[in-house]
């Protein structure tokens, strides 16, 4: 890749995923308020936050270069991503506490839960923004409270939407998965990202 690549995320999971495509990127913290707006749908929320994170990441990159505004910024492609889960029509986010994680998994037990990941790529110089919503459905096993409690205490998925880490023991919670890209569930849909980078004139294969 010729253009500087910025990941607007401090998530170690997203960093590990992006490293599958290239080791040459910089991470910045986007510092975006993730509170949903009144009556905002899951799809609208993840698009708004992914775009906001990409722009905030560009601004942080600009500040680190010592530049005064985006119009004078060196060219970079900034990746923003956000994910929420929907259970029984309600948006759920990161549980933050063990009690909330146990409650989320009790709600999910025996059900199909859809995750929506918003992915944005923003050019810091031209201001071109591309964005996509990538859905992924998880079919949960019917889980006992003892199983859920054991899982939460073992893996502590407190900062994961849906209260699990699919790249770890969380895979044991699932009956089956539905989606085009399993990386989506971890937080960064790589197949979609490759296509979006191509829209900005970049390829990961050279």
Curated annotation (Swiss-Prot):
Enzyme class: hydrolase
GO CC terms of this entry: cytoplasm
Keyword Cytoplasm: yes
Substrates-to-products reaction catalysed: N(7)-methyl-GTP + H2O = N(7)-methyl-GMP + diphosphate + H(+)
Keywords: Cytoplasm, Hydrolase, Nucleotide metabolism
SUPFAM superfamilies per UniProt: ITPase-like (SSF52972)
Signal peptide: none
Molecular-function GO terms, alphabetical: nucleoside triphosphate diphosphatase activity
Protein name (database record): 7-methyl-GTP pyrophosphatase
UniProt organism field: Shewanella denitrificans (strain OS217 / ATCC BAA-1090 / DSM 15013)
